[in-house]
Amino acid sequence: MAALINALDSTPKQCGQNGAVEYGWSNDIREQVLQFSGQIVRTDESKIEIMADKLNKILRSLSWNNSCNVLSDAENKELMVVLYKLIALTRDIVDGKGEYALAYMQVFVWYEFYPELAMFALDKFVLMDNEHPYGSWKDMKYFCNYVRLKTKNDNHPLIDYACNLIIKQIVADQQSNNKALVGKWVPREKSRKFGWIFIILAGKFSPQYLSTATTHEQRVKALTKCKMEFRKVCSALNKELDTVQIKQCAKVWSTIDHTKTTSITNSRQKKAFLNVTKAGKQRSEEDDRIVCAENYKNRIQAATSGVGPEIKGKRVGLDDFAKEAMKLIEQSLYGTSNVNQFEKDALNSQWRDNSKQTGALGEMVAMVDTSGSMTGAGAIYPALSLGIRVAEKSKLGKRIITFSAEPTWHNLEGINDYTECVRELHKASWGMNTNFMKAFDMILNAIIEKKLKPDEAKGFILAVFSDMQFDEARGGDMETIYEVMTKKYADAGRKLHGEPYELPHLLFWNMTCGSGFPVLSTFKNTSFISGYNPSQLNLFCEKGLGFLSTMTPWSMLVQSIDKPRYKCMELKMMEFFGYPDYQ
């Protein structure tokens, strides 16, 4: 209870963009950590910088506490571990949010305080024992570019460390039959964005040439030799990797094995594989491309009919699914080009494959915000996909509420294809204001109409996928949406049964980076999550409503990072600070 009082005392209320009362950034350090985690969602560079400033201040406060003891040792350790493991959760493409830019920002800020911990985290983006790392080798060149833009220093220690990781893996791959994909992601010399990294890597791979050069002319010749040798090594590695891109460059498209093509390549190159232009017309008359297209069509047909496995879609972003579905729908509605049925079938197959990473959910109802702020920010796309995923996995059946100026109840039973689900949701009111209370009243009115008993009225999870910029609710002075909802529910229960209704478990899933919060870290029977990755829904799989009623946003955050994959981060933190007794 003391934690609740402290959070309330330390966290100001404010009016959000659309008039609803919300909580602002707190002065309480624990609350700040929770709020920071809830704003880790894909955004632009300016907001990433705001998040970097928030993280800097939190780390500064926790570091300062080590000498001033404002928090107990146990409290300080807990917050440091949670904050450090957030790096893993942010980048993890398997079981986390899968965000790269926000992860790079966190590593960079941590480096300012604890360089060793920052480098260890970066290491885990590409190297993990006996399991998939948090990211991929693609991260190294993008991270180097991020640091360069931040520091204007090509020789920054973090860049040096990342390049050393690449070189070490290349050397290992030369001697191994089980190669990593580092060769695929090594920057090319002619790349405008990453060519400068190639020069650094070439010098590191053959330092013996540069070490003996004493004059400028000798250094130029030595570097030329370094680059030539490094090009040969990278070319040889890529040939052994036998990637799709290598076959495309070699003009042997017909030899591509579409059962092995990665989910991202499948997503981005459907039209290329089908040998069609954006307008749906044949792209090339070369036999090689025509055979490739026929092979790909056969692959799609096998997946659609159930004869073959689904087309890989595990790593495709939920926003990309919805964007492609919307394009296909618009093409069919307005006749801007020929809609290729194979493209739709491939997308639906990838969706089915992607769905396998989410387990069965309990009694959960999805509410998807389709207001103008969501469409303008592009957050509408992942929100639609998350809503459909919940509907597919919920015990309550395939149903979704969308809300803008008016709420709409969608029954998706009998609609099997993802693209058709998106088409159905697109019929609702989009692009208007964010009248969340009207959507909430739709549910409450149904409960009142059916005269549900108090234990029935709270017997589900309400998952709200929104940017949290709700319209003003008609409550008392400075009452938040949550407070207004609590009172409405309680009053309805008293009127019907003489005892208050309790709210269902409220899952506020934040879809954009902002500065307002619907609940505090200590509010029971609520969750506050953010991001585009559906794997976070697994936190609610096989969880009884009794268990969820005791959960708070803070306990849910702790649970989200309490995974075996992130244990190495915790152990590193304990080793670094010398507190092995941390539990």
Predicted regions and their residues:
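Long lumenal/extracellular ectodomains of secretory and single-pass membrane proteins
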Residues: M1-P382, E392-Q583
